[in-house]
Amino acid sequence: MAQLLTPLESILAIIPALAANGAPVLLKYHGTPIDGGKRFLDGRPVLGPGKTWEGLATGILYGSVIALLAASATCNPKLYAAGVFASIGAMLGDMLGAFIKRRLGLERGAPAPLLDQLDFYSGALLALYAAGYVVHPAVALTFTPIVIALHRLTNMAANRLRLKPVPW
């Protein structure tokens, strides 16, 4: 049965997903593509070269470390499990977003407003739910515009630091 997280638990469960989503950019485009360079039925890449096994592992690992810190700081072990699930969900949601962008004919780095900002967040929320954790509805709704703004600001910063070729 699903367990409703308190507002604080909800926030602390979502933060690892934010960390997981931002971590792969630190690899600066190095890695083995998850899709192996394969193309889908439409002739376009399944995910594209930007989604790598190394990036996936880095994101999940980074988010898991943040989850461990949150669980340790609050003496609440369920935050570790929730944070790990949120991190995995964030990475899977981001990959689904890349799959959708390729189907729409959008190249790597092309902007897709809202999809770019909310694919990983939706994936994190769904993974938490699938694992039996329900993010407090007020937090889920309040965090949506925050996630959009944070995504934009962190991507602009990554672009200025030359970690990303585009600021979106």
From Swiss-Prot:
Its main location: membrane. InterPro entries: CarS, CarS_archaea. Its EC number is 2.7.7.67. The keyword Transmembrane applies. Pfam families: CarS-like. The keyword Flavoprotein does not apply. Its cofactor is Mg(2+). It catalyses: 2,3-bis-O-(geranylgeranyl)-sn-glycerol 1-phosphate + CTP + H(+) = CDP-2,3-bis-O-(geranylgeranyl)-sn-glycerol + diphosphate. It is found in: Cell membrane. Pathway: Membrane lipid metabolism; glycerophospholipid metabolism. Keywords: Cell membrane, Lipid biosynthesis, Lipid metabolism, Magnesium, Membrane, Phospholipid biosynthesis, Phospholipid metabolism, Transferase, Transmembrane, Transmembrane helix. It is a multi-pass membrane protein. GO terms for cellular component: plasma membrane. Catalyzes the formation of CDP-2,3-bis-(O-geranylgeranyl)-sn-glycerol (CDP-archaeol) from 2,3-bis-(O-geranylgeranyl)-sn-glycerol 1-phosphate (DGGGP) and CTP. This reaction is the third ether-bond-formation step in the biosynthesis of archaeal membrane lipids. PANTHER family: CDP-ARCHAEOL SYNTHASE. Belongs to the CDP-archaeol synthase family. This is CDP-archaeol synthase.
